[in-house]
């Protein structure tokens, strides 16, 4: 439960969740919408996944 609250405490992570609620996006696609680096998006996604709020799926060379 603590991990969920920590994940949701970040405004960028809440925005990422809102985007992912409507479409499967890669870190690169999310980064383009937020104008932040892909590594920063990947870190946010790692926190969200650790909290059980998102899952990842590899499709070819991309992770969705």
Q: Which sequence ranges carry the predicted segments?
A:
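N-terminal helix-turn-helix DNA-binding core of bacterial DNA-binding proteins
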Residues: 2-37, 61-64
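Histidine-centered divalent metal-coordination motifs
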Residues: 13, 43-44
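Alpha-helical residues within the helix-turn-helix
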Residues: 32, 43, 49-50
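Beta-hairpin "wing" of winged helix-turn-helix
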Residues: 49-60
């Amino acid at each position: 439960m603590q991990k969920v609250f920590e994940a949701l405490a970040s405004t960028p992570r809440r925005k990422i969740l809102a985007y992912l609620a409507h479409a499967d996006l890669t870190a690169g696609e999310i980064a383009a919408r937020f104008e932040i680096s892909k590594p920063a998006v990947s870190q946010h996604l790692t926190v969200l996944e650790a909290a059980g709020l998102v899952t990842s799926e590899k499709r070819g060379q991309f992770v969705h």
